[in-house]
Structure formats: structure tokens, C-alpha cells
A protein has these predicted regions:
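Bacterial N-terminal signal peptides
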Residues: 5-14
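A solvent-exposed, acidic/Ser-Thr-rich amphipathic alpha-helical stretch
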Residues: 46-112
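A generic structural micro-feature
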Residues: 83-86, 123-129
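Short, surface-exposed loop/helix-turn segments at secondary-structure junctions
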Residues: 117-123
Length: 160
């Protein structure tokens, strides 16, 4: 009798876990991470960006890969002395075919302008680039983290 009750309790727990995962909105949770990345990157918040990745997460851009949170953090912090950036995220497509995993593609338009002490808006001639982020996500305990991100450039602005 005790074995039967334990079996029923275990079955109820497993069904509850399965239902919880099926009702989890991967698109909403992982889209939020995509937007958070853009904002934190523009603020040169290296720790904030690094925390959006798994411990062993990777970010690849222009043939260079940064692996692990520390490397990702240092890449962002290195931009503190560079130009001002704005990453504008538009189209986001997130799909999950396996519990705990998701894939996504998002479009990004990047504007770059010179850093200045002025409070006036920065003048730019056009976007610096338009591309796609190809992401693999891991979802654990309701939190979506980037396992890998690759930037694929599509258009660049050419000064004439």
C-alpha cells in the first residue's frame, strides 16, 4: 500500500513537471534576454551581459569567439573607451523543440557614434551594420540563458 501511494505521488510530481515545462513560454523568456543583451551592451555593463550567458557560454563575432562569462565580460568592458553604440533589436523568432533548450534568430541594427562629454545628441550618417544574432538558449528553473550567440553581418554602411 505504501509503495502504491509513493508511486502515485511520484507520477503526480512527474506529470506536474512535464505540464510546467509545456506551459513555459520560451519565446517570451528568451526574447526578454535578447532585448536585455542590447540594452546592457549599450551601457557597457560587462557583468550584466555576462550574466545573460551560461557559465560556459560563447559569443562569436567577425571570426572571433569569446568563451565563458569572464571573456564575454572583458569584451564588453573593453568597449567603455570606444564609440557610443545603440543596438536596435527588431524581428525575433524563438523556437523550442526540446524541453530546456531553444533556438532563436533576431535582427539587430547597430548605430555607432563618437563618445563625447556633450549632452547634445550624437550625429551619425547612418547605421554601422545590420545583422542577425543566431542564438542557442538553455532554460533552467524558469531562467533563459544564452548558451551560444553568433553575429552574422548582413549589411554595412559605406561612407561615400
Amino acid at each position: 500500500m505504501l509503495l502504491r501511494l509513493l508511486s502515485i505521488a511520484l507520477l503526480g510530481f512527474l506529470v506536474g513537471c512535464q505540464q510546467q515545462d509545456q506551459s513555459f513560454d520560451y519565446s517570451e523568456a528568451c526574447s526578454s534576454v535578447v532585448h536585455d543583451y542590447a540594452y546592457l551592451r549599450d551601457q557597457t555593463d560587462g557583468q550584466g551581459v555576462a550574466n545573460l550567458f551560461t557559465d560556459e557560454g560563447s559569443f562569436s563575432i567577425f571570426g572571433e569567439t569569446f568563451s565563458g562569462r569572464q571573456a564575454i565580460k572583458q569584451r564588453v568592458l573593453g568597449a567603455e573607451v570606444g564609440p557610443v553604440t545603440r543596438h536596435l533589436i527588431s524581428t525575433i523568432d524563438i523556437e523550442s523543440k526540446t524541453p530546456g533548450k531553444a533556438r532563436g534568430v533576431s535582427y539587430v541594427t547597430v548605430y555607432i557614434g563618437p563618445r563625447s562629454d556633450s549632452t547634445n545628441p550624437i550625429e551619425v550618417e547612418g547605421f554601422a551594420g545590420i545583422g542577425e544574432y543566431h542564438d542557442r538558449f538553455v532554460v533552467d528553473a524558469g531562467e533563459c540563458l544564452i548558451e551560444s550567440r553568433e553575429f552574422i553581418p548582413v549589411f554595412t554602411y559605406q561612407d561615400k
